[in-house]
């Protein structure tokens, strides 16, 4: 390090006569030096005089830096015994240092002063430009950047010789060297906003940028309070000087200790001064300054309030973070009533403290932060470069390539650039031959790669016989070297190995002159999807931007049209069906399965491309898109075109729909046949009965359809239980169509009693029902002989219709026309008994059947009377009475009618199931309703019913002895109910359980026995004695 840093001293430095007249040869001592050395000999004994402003000054302080460096080299060549005196004299001469701390006698050493004169003459003669200029206004401070507007624009240090460059670019903490103060007053009196400092022939406008330039390179780690302007500097003895380095060392503490604080403060305060606002207490001028000399170091260019969207508290946070200090808000006081309080908040910003009042704590915090920002002595952070608002006019920084990538991704197209091989630069550009790039500086031969054009930073200025860089620091500074320096290779590979020269004239290089090479334009090909664009530019990047701009013009129109089409499609979708729905509908009409399948996915993860296949029967189409839904839609659109080529549909394809519609007329036909069967019997009420059946059948059919009472699966299971065989087994045979098909077909097979039937349907449930219906019809056709017209009509009817037809069947059974099925209990007809849930319908059926079958029931009642008469003659002592016999006749008639009614209505399912609890529950309500019907249809009084009740119980006991089964009555107390309950159990096969209800236990037993007799008559056991 060969820098010679000297600090400014608060003493006048007047060189007006010397620099303007240049007539100092007649003086023994240099006039400029006499003004300095005279007071310097007396400065150690007396305090310095107050600073005075000279009338005018030349601009000698801002000399060329190259000559100053030459002067320093001459000073280093002096002998060691003269080093101390020369250093002190040089310091006094160059910096106005009254306080030179030299231990030697300066006035007696004429040789040293002669050398100083020679150096000064050399400086004056070499700076002839300065002597001819008229005196300008008094300079404020030396500004090494004033004559270098380029460096000011880039906020960099002035250029130095090459061997000094590393020292200046390394650290920001140390102040820049060679800051020469040309006046006695310190830098804190300067105001850069006044345009009063003309710097060595430079424009005044450049001086305004000096604070920014130095501000970027000089940082203060802590707050500096400037001491008073005039201070008494005590001499410090200088240690022995042994080498030349001790004299010229810029950081030597032994020679500048007494003046070091002022040096640091002047150099650090100089860039931090700003133009204060015009107020009474903040105004600072040359003659008015506070006692401590402290000034706010806020820079107007970095004002914290420049950001519109940042609150004062946010700016304080940035200020504290920038200066590496802590800040804290404290609520120090609350005063005033509860509804209108005033809060005092104190902000501790490092060592500073600010307080503010507000009606809200947050408001007081912001006020304290605003006060701190305005009055703080800490350095403000540099303003951040704010990006333009979204959608603003400054959104031009987006390059065409970036915009093209976004648009192509939106359209689902891939982009890639294809470079011509002749445009590719050489790969081995790290170390050119002989470190000079000889093959790049000479013109390449035919077929060789052409050198790319230079970047913006590679422009150079022509000066003398060599090339010198422009003042701005280049991106790759190691590429630039002076005429006398040897070039060295770069440490890291860069984009351009060596910038090619510009211009058509011959250039001078380190290996001799070489002609300029014309640079051909770069050419690149851009592919966007299946489209091709060619871009041309001076550089490869410009060619890419040109190609991207051409592609954008085409793709933007495509994107607009695509968005319009999508909008129209979305509007039309509300009116018509999508292509996918249309394909499914056509598949259902033509009985063809429709299936969509994603075949493959292509492209990167952020821009997938899907290929989906649409399969309808044997026709396959493919669709492509950036989403599965889009590709599926496009495949469906292609499929619609293919399906339109098929021949038109034939009407035979809709037969399954016709078969479904045929079911309803079948029920009405069965009802019609039922009406003909019922009306076939003669009776007085034949004329009115068909009209009543027509009136009651339609609502009954609707109820059955709603409640699904005629489920063939249930009917088949009940039939198997009645026949004491295994339940039917259902099995799915085939399934036509996949999960995505709108209409599928299932084939179900059911097997029971060695018979098998199949059914088809669009669902498994429907196929199962169809199969059960087919098997049920098959099993009933096997049981019943085809000669029985009544039974054949019953097979085609529903359960409700069948229950209405069973009364004639029982009559035929009484006459012996229906073959009996052999059971352990006795013969029983082969009919299926189903449970009826519609009680009102039962009542109507019972009434109709009773009126139409009066004669047949009377014949059956006579047979029952004979059985009852035999029982009464054997067991009753009072059976001879005519009244008893008449009552027995009436009761027997009632019992016969009840048995016929029960046979017709099918009031109990106990003959099918052995579950006693279900039987009790089912027979409870039915028997209660039937008991009312019996009362209505009978002409006997209640007393006759009660007296005949004994006969009902005894008749059941007598019948049990004849058929060899046991009867067990179980009585339950009244409890909370109004009636008594009796349960009768019959040990028949299967066992039967019935219950009865009455106001007394006797009545309940008779009711239970009556219900048991009804069940036995229903099973045909009452005919066993014949």
UniProtKB/Swiss-Prot annotation:
Positions with biased composition (Low complexity): 70-111, 192-210, 234-256, 864-890, 902-920, 934-947
Biased composition (Polar residues): 112-126, 285-303, 678-688, 891-901
Record field: compositional bias (Basic and acidic residues): 267-284
Phosphoserine, modified sites: 563, 570, 676
Subcellular location: Cytoplasm, Cytoplasmic ribonucleoprotein granule
GO molecular function: double-stranded RNA binding; lncRNA binding; mRNA 3'-UTR binding; mRNA binding
Outcome recorded upon mutating residue 632 to A: Abolishes RNA binding without altering the conformation of the domain
Region Disordered, residue ranges: 16-159, 190-210, 234-311, 647-707, 855-948
A Pfam cross-reference name: Staufen_C
Domain DRBM, chain residue ranges per copy: 311-378, 490-557, 578-645, 711-781, 951-1018
Gene Ontology biological process terms in this record: anterior/posterior axis specification, embryo; anterograde dendritic transport of messenger ribonucleoprotein complex; asymmetric protein localization involved in cell fate determination; bicoid mRNA localization; germ cell development; intracellular mRNA localization; long-term memory; neuroblast fate determination
InterPro entries cross-referenced by the UniProt entry: DRBM-containing_protein (IPR051740), dsRBD_dom (IPR014720), Staufen_C (IPR032478)
Tissue-wise expression: Polar granules at the posterior pole of the oocyte, and by the time the egg is laid, at the anterior pole.
Keywords carried by this UniProt record: Cytoplasm, Developmental protein, Phosphoprotein, Repeat, RNA-binding
Biased composition (Basic residues): 16-29
Subunit composition and interactions: Component of neuronal ribonucleoprotein complexes (RNPs) that contains at least various translational repressor and mRNA turnover proteins such as me31B, tral, Upf1, AGO2 and sometimes Fmr1.
Role this protein plays: RNA-binding protein which forms ribonucleoprotein complexes (RNPs) that play critical roles in the localization, translational repression and turnover of RNAs during embryogenesis, neurotransmission and neurogenesis. In the oocyte, essential for the localization of both the osk/oskar mRNA to the posterior pole and bcd/bicoid RNA to the anterior pole, and is therefore required for the correct anterior-posterior patterning of the developing embryo. Association with osk or bcd at their respective poles, appears to promote the formation and stabilization of the ribonucleoprotein complexes.
Domain notes: Contains a proline-rich domain. The insertion of this domain in the DRBM 2 domain is required for stau-oskar mRNA localization.
Protein name: Maternal effect protein staufen
Species for this entry: Drosophila melanogaster (Fruit fly)
């Amino acid at each position: 390090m060969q820098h010679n840093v000297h600090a400014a001293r608060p003493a006048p430095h007047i060189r007006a006569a010397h620099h303007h007249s240049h007539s100092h040869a007649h003086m023994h001592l240099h006039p400029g030096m006499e003004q300095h050395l005279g007071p310097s000999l007396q400065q150690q004994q007396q305090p310095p005089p107050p600073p005075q402003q000279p009338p005018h000054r030349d601009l000698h302080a801002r000399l060329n830096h190259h000559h100053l460096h030459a002067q320093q080299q001459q000073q280093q060549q002096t002998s060691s015994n003269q080093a101390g005196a020369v250093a002190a004299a040089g310091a006094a001469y160059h910096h106005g240092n009254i306080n030179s701390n030299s231990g030697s006698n300066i006035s007696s050493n004429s040789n040293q002063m002669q050398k100083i004169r020679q150096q000064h003459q050399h400086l004056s003669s070499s700076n002839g430009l300065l002597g001819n200029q008229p005196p300008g206004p008094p300079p404020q401070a030396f500004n090494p950047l004033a004559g270098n507007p380029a460096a000011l624009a880039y906020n960099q240090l002035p250029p130095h010789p090459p061997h000094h460059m590393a020292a200046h670019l390394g650290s920001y903490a140390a102040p820049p060297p060679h800051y020469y103060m040309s006046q006695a007053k310190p830098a804190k009196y300067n105001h850069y906003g006044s345009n009063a400092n003309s710097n060595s022939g430079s424009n005044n406008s450049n001086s305004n940028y000096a604070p920014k330039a130095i501000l970027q390179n000089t940082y203060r780690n802590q707050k500096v309070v400037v001491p008073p302007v005039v201070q008494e500097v005590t001499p410090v003895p200088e240690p022995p000087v042994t080498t030349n380095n001790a004299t010229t060392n810029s950081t030597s503490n032994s020679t500048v200790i007494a003046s070091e604080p002022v040096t640091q403060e002047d150099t650090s305060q100089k860039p931090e001064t700003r133009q204060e606002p015009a107020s009474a207490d903040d105004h600072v001028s040359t003659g008015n300054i506070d006692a401590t000399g402290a000034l706010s170091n806020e820079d107007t260019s970095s004002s914290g309030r420049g950001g519109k969207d940042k609150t004062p508290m946010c700016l304080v946070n940035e200020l504290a973070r920038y200066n590496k200090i802590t800040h804290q808000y404290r609520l120090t006081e609350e005063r005033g009533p509860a509804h209108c309080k005033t809060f005092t908040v104190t902000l501790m910003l490092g060592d500073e403290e600010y307080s503010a009042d507000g009606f809200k704590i947050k408001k007081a915090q912001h006020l304290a932060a605003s006060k701190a920002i305005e009055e703080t002595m800490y350095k403000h952070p540099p303003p951040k470069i704010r990006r333009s608002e979204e959608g603003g006019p400054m959104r031009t920084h987006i390059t065409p390539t970036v915009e093209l990538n976004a648009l192509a991704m939106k359209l689902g197209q891939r982009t890639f650039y294809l470079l011509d091989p002749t445009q590719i630069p050489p790969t081995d550009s790290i170390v050119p031959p002989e470190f000079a790039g000889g093959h790049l500086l000479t013109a390449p031969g035919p077929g060789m790669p052409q050198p790319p054009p230079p970047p913006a930073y590679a422009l150079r200025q022509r000066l003398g016989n060599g090339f010198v860089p422009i003042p701005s620091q280049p991106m790759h500074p190691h590429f630039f070297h002076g005429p006398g320096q040897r070039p060295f290779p770069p440490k890291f590979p860069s984009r351009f190995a060596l910038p090619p020269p510009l211009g058509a004239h011959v250039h001078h290089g380190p290996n001799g002159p070489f002609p300029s090479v014309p640079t051909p334009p770069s050419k690149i090909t851009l592919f966007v999807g299946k489209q091709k664009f060619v871009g041309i530019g001076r550089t490869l990047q410009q060619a890419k931007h040109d190609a991207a701009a051409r592609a954008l013009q085409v793709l933007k129109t495509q994107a607009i049209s695509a968005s319009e089409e999508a909008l129209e499609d979305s509007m039309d979708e509300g009116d018509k069906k999508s292509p996918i729905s249309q394909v499914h509908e056509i598949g259902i009409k033509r009985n063809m399965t429709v299936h969509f399948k994603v075949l493959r996915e292509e492209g990167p993860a952020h821009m997938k491309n899907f290929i989906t296949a649409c399969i309808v029967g044997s026709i396959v189409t493919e669709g492509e898109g950036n989403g599965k839904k889009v590709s599926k839609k496009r495949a469906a659109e292609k499929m619609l075109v293919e399906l339109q080529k098929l021949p038109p549909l034939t009407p035979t394809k809709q037969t399954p729909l016709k078969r479904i519609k045929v079911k309803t007329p079948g029920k009405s036909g069965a009802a019609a046949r039922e009406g003909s069967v019922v009306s076939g019997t003669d009776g007085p009420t034949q004329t009115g009965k068909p009209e009543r059946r027509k009136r009651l059948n339609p609502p009954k059919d609707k109820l059955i359809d709603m409640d699904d009472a005629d489920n063939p699966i249930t009917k088949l299971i009940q039939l198997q239980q009645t026949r004491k065989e295994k339940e039917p087994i259902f099995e799915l045979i085939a399934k036509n169509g996949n999960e995505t098909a709108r209409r599928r077909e299932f084939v179900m097979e059911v097997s029971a009693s060695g018979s098998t039937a199949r059914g088809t349907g669009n669902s498994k449930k429907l196929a199962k029902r169809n199969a059960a219906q087919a098997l049920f019809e098959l099993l009933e056709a096997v049981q019943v002989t085809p000669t029985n017209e009544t039974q054949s009509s019953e097979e085609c009817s529903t359960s409700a219709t069948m229950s209405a037809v069973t009364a004639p069947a029982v009559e035929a059974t009484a006459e012996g026309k229906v073959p009996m099925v052999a059971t352990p209990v006795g013969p029983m007809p082969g009919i299926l008994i189903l449970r009826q849930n519609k009680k009102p319908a039962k009542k109507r059926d019972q009434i109709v059947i009773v009126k139409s079958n009066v004669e047949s029931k009377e014949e059956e009642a006579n047979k029952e009377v004979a059985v009852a008469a035999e029982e009464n003659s054997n067991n009753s002592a009072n059976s001879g009475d005519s009244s008893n016999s008449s009552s027995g006749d009436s009761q027997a008639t009632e019992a016969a009618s009840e048995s016929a009614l029960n046979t017709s209505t099918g009031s109990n399912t106990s003959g099918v199931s052995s579950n006693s609890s279900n039987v009790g529950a089912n027979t409870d309500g039915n028997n209660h309703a039937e008991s009312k019907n019996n009362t209505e249809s009978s002409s006997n009084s209640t007393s006759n019913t009660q007296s005949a009740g004994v006969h009902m119980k005894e008749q059941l006991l007598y019948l049990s002895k004849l058929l060899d089964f046991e009867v067990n009555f179980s009585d339950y107390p009244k409890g909370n109910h109004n009636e008594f309950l009796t349960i009768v159990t019959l040990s028949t096969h299967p066992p039967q359980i019935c219950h009865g209800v009455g106001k007394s236990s006797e009545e309940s037993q008779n009711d239970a026995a009556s219900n048991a007799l009804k069940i036995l008559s229903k099973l045909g056991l009452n005919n066993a004695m014949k």
